[in-house]
C-alpha cells in the first residue's frame, strides 16, 4: 500500500502502480519591486491600469522529482505613468510517481502552478503594500484552462509559428 502523508493523493494508474503527488518544498526563488512613480504616484488619485503576466516552467531534478516555477509580473500604471512593477518567482519541488506520460505535462503545467499561486499572490500583495500602495488581491487563475490554451497553440504551431510572448511561456522553457 502506498503511503499518503497528507501532502499528496494516491489512486490507481493504468499500469497498476499507484499515483503519488507530493509537495517536497515551496520556496521564493526571486522577487523584485520597483516604484519608479514614487513619491509622485501617492499624490494622484489611484485609478490604476493593471497588467498581469503569468509564466511557468518546469525541469526534472531527479527520478520522479521536478522543479516548477511560477512567475507573476504585475505592472501598475496610473495617469499613464508606471507606478510600480512587481515580479515574484515562486518555486516548488514536487514528487510525482505513477502518472502516465500523457498526464505528466498537465500535472506539471497546470496542477503544480495552481499549488504555487496562493504563495505568489500573497508575496505580491505584501510587496505592493510595503511599497506604500493599496493592497492587490489577484483574482484566482484557472491554470487548467491556460494549459489547454497553450497546448492548442503549440499543436497549431507545428504548421505555423506560435507567438513568442505567450502568457505562460509554453509551460516550459
Curated annotation (Swiss-Prot):
Cellular component terms per the entry's GO annotation: cytoplasm
Protein's GO biological process: protein folding; protein tetramerization; protein transport
The organism's place on the tree of life at top rank: Bacteria
This protein's record includes keyword Cytoplasm: yes
Annotated Polar residues bias: 158-167
InterPro entries per the UniProt record, alphabetical: SecB, SecB-like_sf
Recorded GO MF terms: unfolded protein binding
Stretches for region Disordered: 148-173
Subcellular location: Cytoplasm
Keywords: Chaperone, Cytoplasm, Protein transport, Translocation, Transport
Keyword Cytoplasm: yes
Function: One of the proteins required for the normal export of preproteins out of the cell cytoplasm. It is a molecular chaperone that binds to a subset of precursor proteins, maintaining them in a translocation-competent state. It also specifically binds to its receptor SecA.
Family: Belongs to the SecB family.
HAMAP family linked to this entry: SecB
Subunit details: Homotetramer, a dimer of dimers. One homotetramer interacts with 1 SecA dimer.
Name this protein carries in UniProt: Protein-export protein SecB
Amino acid at each position: 500500500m502506498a503511503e499518503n502523508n497528507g501532502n499528496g493523493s494516491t489512486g490507481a494508474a493504468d499500469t497498476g502502480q499507484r499515483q503519488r503527488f507530493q509537495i517536497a518544498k515551496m520556496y521564493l526563488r526571486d522577487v523584485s519591486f520597483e516604484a519608479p512613480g514614487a513619491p509622485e504616484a501617492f499624490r494622484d488619485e489611484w485609478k490604476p491600469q493593471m497588467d498581469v503576466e503569468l509564466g511557468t516552467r518546469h525541469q526534472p531534478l531527479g527520478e520522479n522529482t521536478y522543479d516548477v516555477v511560477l512567475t507573476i509580473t504585475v505592472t501598475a500604471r496610473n495617469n499613464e505613468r508606471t507606478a510600480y512593477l512587481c515580479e515574484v518567482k515562486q518555486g516548488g519541488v514536487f514528487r510525482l510517481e505513477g502518472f502516465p506520460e500523457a498526464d505528466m505535462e498537465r500535472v506539471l503545467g497546470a496542477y503544480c502552478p495552481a499549488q504555487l499561486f496562493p504563495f505568489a499572490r500573497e508575496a505580491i500583495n505584501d510587496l505592493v503594500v510595503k511599497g506604500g500602495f493599496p493592497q492587490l488581491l489577484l483574482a484566482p487563475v484557472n491554470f487548467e484552462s491556460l494549459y489547454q490554451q497553450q497546448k492548442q497553440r503549440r499543436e497549431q504551431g507545428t504548421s505555423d509559428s506560435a507567438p513568442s510572448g505567450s502568457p505562460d511561456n509554453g509551460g516550459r522553457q
